[in-house]
């Protein structure tokens, strides 16, 4: 099964989730694997109790993860890692990506680096928390002594529209960075 548990707005505006879903379905077809897709809208009750295995994309809260574990213990999350004690996960190393971006900008002579990002969510509360990309950016920029809070813009969600809006907002500032990590 493919558990495609993205928020409706994420699915429409976050290219990452849509590309992951499309590629999973494409690869499954190539290998003659039938994947039944269950969405967040379908709810946890739609997932069959005799599920053999799953691939999950999107965000689940603690209650949903525990319920899923009672249904099926063989699953892999892509893009998120909600509970590494219960399920495996495949996700990009965002910490390394951001560190490499800041290193690259510094190597190219940039000393003013901006950052546009969004929040993560606490798995237990669902409340916003600092995303690993922002944390990594702050650590890397601090290391190079070039952290400038005026150049850090955080939205309440990860969407193309929000990134565009924050980029335009950054351009209205009196001084702007010479490089930007988005």
Label every PLM stretch briefly:
Residues 44, 62-65:
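Short, charged/polar "capping" segments at the starts of alpha-helices
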Residues 1-8, 15-37, 41, 52-53, ...:
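Bacterial carbohydrate/catabolite-sensing allosteric modules
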Residues 8-10, 60-63:
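Short acidic, S/G/P-rich loop/turn micro-motifs used as interaction or catalytic elements
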Residues 46-59:
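Short, well-ordered secondary-structure micro-motifs within conserved domains or adaptor modules
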């Amino acid at each position: 099964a493919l558990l495609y548990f993205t928020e409706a707005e994420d699915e429409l505006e976050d290219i990452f989730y849509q590309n992951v879903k499309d590629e999973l379905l494409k690869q499954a077809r190539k290998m003659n694997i039938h994947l039944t897709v269950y969405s967040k809208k379908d709810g946890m009750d739609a997932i069959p109790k005799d599920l053999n295995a799953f691939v999950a994309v999107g965000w689940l809260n603690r209650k949903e993860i525990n319920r899923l574990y009672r249904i099926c213990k063989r699953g892999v999350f892509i893009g998120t890692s909600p509970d590494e004690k219960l399920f495996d996960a495949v996700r990009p190393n965002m910490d390394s990506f951001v560190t490499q971006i800041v290193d690259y900008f510094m190597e190219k002579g940039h000393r003013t680096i901006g950052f546009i990002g969004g929040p993560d969510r606490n798995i237990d509360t669902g409340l916003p928390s600092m995303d690993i990309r922002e944390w990594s950016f702050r650590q890397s920029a601090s290391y190079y002594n070039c952290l400038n809070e005026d150049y850090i813009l955080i939205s309440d969600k990860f969407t193309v529209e929000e990134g565009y809006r924050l980029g335009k907002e950054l351009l209205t500032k009196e001084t702007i960075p010479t490089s930007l990590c988005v």
